[in-house]
Curated annotation (Swiss-Prot):
Gene3D superfamilies named in the record: Ribosomal protein L17 (3.90.1030.10)
Molecular function as annotated in GO: structural constituent of ribosome
Gene from which the chain derives: rplQ
Keywords: Ribonucleoprotein, Ribosomal protein
Protein name in the entry: Large ribosomal subunit protein bL17
PANTHER family: LARGE RIBOSOMAL SUBUNIT PROTEIN BL17M, RIBOSOMAL PROTEIN L17
Keyword Ribonucleoprotein: yes
Gene Ontology annotations for the cellular component aspect, listed alphabetically: cytosolic large ribosomal subunit
Domain of life: Bacteria
PROSITE patterns recorded: RIBOSOMAL_L17 (PS01167)
Subunit structure as annotated in this protein's UniProt entry: Part of the 50S ribosomal subunit. Contacts protein L32.
Length: 139
């Protein structure tokens, strides 16, 4: 019987799930909107909501707790500075999930998870490490 089992396994080990959601939460905080499968979005939502609540409360111990969950110091800084200030008057409900059709390859249901009142300029900003062109051309 499945009584009392509230989270989806998503066909992954516990370590893989934890790492995946840490990466997804960091990406969501960085870009303020990501596209993923619907079950992953539904599982990610409470994780991010709790992180934003930590950011709103502030304090060194809660910042360290957020770092241990997110594993990204830059996104924790954004969480505790920008997002905490933005949602200081909102009592929960910081994210929304919008269904986005089905994926072409396997027909998986897709969804967009984004922050309510998000900064539209944050999407696509600094999308990852980029190699220096000057170093490769100088050789």
């Amino acid at each position: 019987m499945r009584h009392g089992k509230v989270h989806r396994k998503l066909n992954r080990t516990a370590e893989h799930r934890k790492a995946m959601f840490a990466n997804m939460a960091a990406s969501l905080i960085k870009h303020e909107q990501i596209v993923t499968t619907l079950p992953k979005a539904k599982e990610l939502r409470p994780i991010v909501e709790k992180l934003v609540t930590l950011g709103k409360k502030g304090g060194l111990a809660l910042r360290r707790q957020a770092i241990s969950e997110l594993r990204d110091h830059d996104q924790v800084k954004k969480l505790f500075d920008a997002l905490a200030a933005r949602y200081k008057d909102r009592q929960g409900g910081y994210t929304r999930i919008i269904k986005a059709g089905f994926r072409y390859g396997d027909n998986a249901p897709m969804a967009v998870i984004e922050f309510v009142d998000r900064d539209v300029d944050a999407k696509g900003q600094d999308s990852g490490p980029v190699q220096e062109k000057a170093d490769s051309e100088a050789a």
